[in-house]
Amino acid sequence: LGWPFKSPRYVGKPVPRVEDRRFVTGTGLFIDDLKLPGMLYAAIVRSRMAHARIRSIETGRAERMRGVVAVLTAKDVEQHAGFLATDGGEGVPRARPLASGKVRYYGEPVAMVIAEDRYVAYDAAELVEVEYERLEPVVDVEAALRDGAPLVHEELGTNVAFTHRRSGGDPEEAFGTADVVRKYRFRIQRLAAVPMETRGIVAEYEKGTGRLVVHTTHQFPHDLRRWTAEALGIPLSDVRVVVHDVGGAFGSKITHYPEDVLVPLAAKLLGRPVKWIESRSESLAVSTQGRGIVAEVEVAAKSSGRLLGARLKVLGDVGAYLFYATKLPFTNVLSMFPGVYRLKGMEGELIGVYTNKVPAGPYRGAGRPEASYLIERTVERLAREMGVDPAEFRAINFVRREEFPYRTVTGHTYDSGDYEAALRKALDLLGYSQMRGLKERARAEGKLVGIGLSTYVEVCNFASQSARVMVGEDGKVTVYTSTMPHGQGEQTAFAQLVADFFGIGIEDVRVFYGDTDLAPEGGGTAGSWTLTSGGAAILAACERVREKMLRVAAHLLEANPDDVVMEGGRFYVRGHEERAVGFREVAEAAHDEDALPEDVEPGLEAYAFHSPKLTYPFGAHAVVVEVDPETYQVRILKAVMVDDCGNVVNPLLVEGQLIGGAVQALGQALYEEVVYDSEGQLVTAALTDYLVPTAVEVPRFEIDRTVTPAPNPLGTKGVGEAATIGFTQAVINAVEDALWPLRLEGSPAKPSYLWEVTRNG
């Protein structure tokens, strides 16, 4: 399936990342490296209250400070700019770049200071005086739905942002024929993405052309270009977005933020470049946060362990506004809940709830980790309560290999899979039977050891992509892709594909992205779709270039194009391999009008667009933990991941994505949690409070894979979010097993939480 390489030199091999040289030598170009002549610096004045009316804003002291060029408030901005983008539809309250009349979350922008120096801008921002009238905030989704709760948007008369339902099969029959019915409650905390590089923007207004050039860290350059034009009321052709190197994103650089409007507007109004770089505390406070749900799961099963059906009621904490992509993670929860199991019926309801918090958004996995968490926590706990080994319980209920393509009760059609093979390999790698023996011996000695499993399936490949491929007369290949890397290694993977397709050296391939004047239209990078969709577009463009090169080679060889073969960086006549010309020779001829047939124009360039089909990567993760019975610290004794992302282009990149995702999943399971107090003030406003795993906490991961090719041009599936989708609940399941028969409703499994659980029984 979909593997156009006979004897690849690069594809399938652990090729070191070609982009790493510039990163390790400090020659990369990140947003804060940009220094333009006459550049000004912006600082944002943010609300220190979560819910309040703005009585007045006094900017005089800030404006009089030496070096300050301008101070903008809502009344200034509203003359020139509209609303932020939303995916909420008609009638949904839309945010403005600067709050007007009311603030609805801690950190919401209320003014912007522009100065000659970054630190002058910061100091002047402290001088802007805002008088507030406090309003009662609502920071808990369940409290937000109670009668008489404070309203985030009074005009709606409710805190319900949206309701999403997903049902299928026959849930009534499933529950009516069940021998066992259980109801569980789970709470998944809000998380911050914490990319190594925070967000940033440098905008410049070209007076000669009337164009805005916006340098940014955004994941979707073409979307941001469109949003910028719409918000500022200018033609799309007057906006150019350029993204350089980006130090991580994890979904936090997808949405349309206030600064995405404010900084370009300031550059346009002042006629000088303006830079804004998000501080770490700002990143924790105002970049979109992920997860954040409360769920009740009711499950029905036969006494044999056969799952029958499920009912879900989920509350999603959307924050104060529906920004672009706020809804997506929450709607994914219901659609992917069935996971790897055959359910006869399911019905679910998810209510998106407004709270006085920063808007939610995608975070590595975007709803699929939540869905997998809910079903895997349910399955593991139900198995233990029924006295069935959790591994065997899963095997009883897996979608079988021979059942693919398999349509779930929520409407997804899984294209391929072998879930049992992945689980068996993970169990073997873990030494499952030996670990079960270790657990029993440890318990006899008063130690708390637990084993947790997780088998997952995810959906990815949502976005269409395009590519432009050009071969120069020197034989070098240039690729422009609509994808937008921020650490994944796309330049390496794409160069591998192109090098093997043409049979040339990987050093002869250059991959460019991120400039809307050069890169073709497409979906950017997110959702584990880059290689499968972006790679397919690149190969389609390569094929069109190849077809022209075959005609040129045939002309040089005085042969019929149908008889010419491209292989190993040369073109030869089928059956007469000695009649051959090299790749560079053909490329040179293709740019020489005199060397071409009359009906062939000079140049080697092709564009291709790929509209993808969904793919469904899967895997099995297993974890052994020990919980200290006195301090309740959790220590990972062993961690195993077996994942299936179809054909593998670069195993080094795959392993890097899995380890990185597993570290973030470990953070969700044991350490990370965005905390607000009752006033909506952010408690975890620094990395001293928002704890992320360090090298000390990260275990050694044992990684393996199965290979089930997907039915697409490359046979690949996504892997960028696999570990965040599968690993978290393996850890939590292991902790719950160690404390069994106690139950864990929430996460992370911090010592304080585990102590509370054990104290309350």
Show which residues each predicted segment covers.
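Flexible, low-hydrophobicity surface segments
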Residues: 1-162
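Glycine-rich loop/linker segments at domain edges
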Residues: 13, 19-22, 89, 93, ...
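Short, aliphatic-rich beta-strand segments
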Residues: 42, 212-216, 476-481, 636-638
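C-terminal catalytic domains of large/alpha subunits in multi-subunit enzymes
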Residues: 64, 74-75, 233-238, 268-274, ...
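Short acidic, glycine/serine/threonine-rich loops at helix termini
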Residues: 81-86, 124-127, 225-227, 250-256, ...
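Helix-loop-helix junctions that connect adjacent transmembrane helices in secondary transporters/permeases
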Residues: 146-232, 398-476, 683-694, 702-704
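Thiamine diphosphate
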Residues: 236, 249-271, 275-277, 490-498
